[in-house]
């Protein structure tokens, strides 16, 4: 990774630390500035990374952009959870497309990831879906579809065979599952801070994946 990309990732890391602090302290004004800066820094890093595949880079940048929209939507005072989830869903679809674009996916790694995802999700997913069902049919359907797409993202990230993508996919799955748990079941250990930490680490991982 070149100097420019490294500096931008480092700056994104600093913004992330500020964001996590603001979330823990419930400083919404600081969070409103720091949270978008994390993803903006990572978008810049993705654009600066030396990679021979411009299409995959473009898809990752677009996914980061969709995630940025979701972050901003969920921070607004009159935030609509559905709109934020839709933006994140678009980000997942773009990441999935990027993985498929690379070709040569490792079936063995994908199967292993699928088994792990099913095992981990066995306890949490039914409770999240049950909680979403109480919010109405639209929310129930939206959350169910989102969880399925999230699982596919993690599965295909593992199937790339790249360690950075594997870890990033697992972290993104964890982040979104925690978000759903906090929203529809109960406050998860670490609350919103852990959601942010895992989410930001996942996006960093996908940017690093571009260099592999």
Task: Give a label for each model feature.
Residues 1-212:
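Polytopic alpha-helical membrane-helix bundles and their juxtamembrane interface segments
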């Amino acid at each position: 990774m070149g100097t420019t990309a490294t500096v931008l990732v480092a700056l994104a890391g600093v913004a992330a630390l500020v964001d996590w602090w603001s979330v823990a302290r419930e400083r919404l004004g600081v969070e409103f500035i720091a949270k978008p800066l994390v993803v903006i820094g990572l978008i810049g890093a993705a654009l600066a990374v030396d990679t021979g595949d411009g299409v995959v880079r473009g898809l990752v940048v677009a996914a980061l952009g969709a995630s940025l929209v979701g972050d901003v939507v969920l921070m607004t005072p009159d935030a609509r959870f559905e709109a934020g989830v839709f933006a994140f869903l678009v980000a997942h679809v773009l990441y999935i497309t990027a993985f498929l674009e690379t070709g040569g996916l490792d079936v063995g790694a994908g199967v292993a990831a699928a088994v792990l995802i099913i095992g981990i999700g066995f306890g949490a997913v039914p409770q999240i879906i049950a909680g979403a069902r109480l919010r109405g049919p639209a929310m129930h359907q939206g959350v169910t579809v989102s969880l399925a797409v999230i699982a596919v993202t993690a599965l295909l990230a593992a199937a790339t065979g790249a360690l950075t993508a594997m870890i990033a996919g697992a972290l993104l799955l964890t982040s979104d599952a925690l978000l759903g748990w906090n929203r529809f079941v109960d406050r998860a250990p670490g609350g919103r801070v852990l959601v942010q930490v895992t989410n930001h680490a996942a996006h960093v991982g996908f940017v690093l994946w571009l260099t592999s």
